[in-house]
A protein has these predicted regions:
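Conserved alpha-helical scaffold segments that buttress catalytic/binding sites
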Residues: 2-147
């Protein structure tokens, strides 16, 4: 069965505080993800990238929630876009970026499903809070934020 897929890139790195992961969406596109998905019979619409912030342009803010304002802003935008894609009957494929983008992805999907399940596969639980985190990077708090 053919699916209609919409791709959103989120070149975010402030959740981890290290450059490099922000190149993920570009690298995945460069690796020809769109043509590969089309080759198995799906229709793909690339919506481009959500605007993310650079650490050079913003303050770290509260050290127990590094770059909280910016991470929240990007994830709010992402949640709205994911929800809109699902409302159109399409499947959202989100390319990141650091792990904090799971917050917006889960929030957008959860608007459409009352009994949403999530399978979380990661080397870490990522359920830290500002009280349990040793780094205070939000990418390690994303599952706690989503719950």
């Amino acid at each position: 069965m053919s699916k209609q897929i919409s791709i959103i890139g989120v070149p975010m790195y402030l959740g981890v505080g290290r450059r490099g992961v922000d190149m993920g969406p570009s690298a995945i596109r460069y690796a020809n993800i769109i043509e590969r998905i089309k080759s198995v019979g799906h229709e793909v619409k690339d919506l481009g990238d959500i605007e993310a912030y650079n650490s050079e342009d913003v303050e770290v803010g509260n050290l127990k929630f590094k770059y909280l304002r910016e991470v929240v802003a990007v994830n709010t935008d992402l949640a709205q876009q994911v929800s809109a894609i699902i409302s159109e009957g399409r499947f959202p494929l989100v390319l990141g970026g650091d792990h904090s983008i799971a917050i917006g992805t889960i929030a957008g999907v959860s608007e459409h499903y009352d009994n949403l399940g999530l399978i979380w596969v990661d080397a870490h639980a990522d359920i830290n809070t500002h009280e349990t985190s040793s780094s205070w990077n939000i990418h390690g708090m994303r599952l706690a934020a989503s719950l």
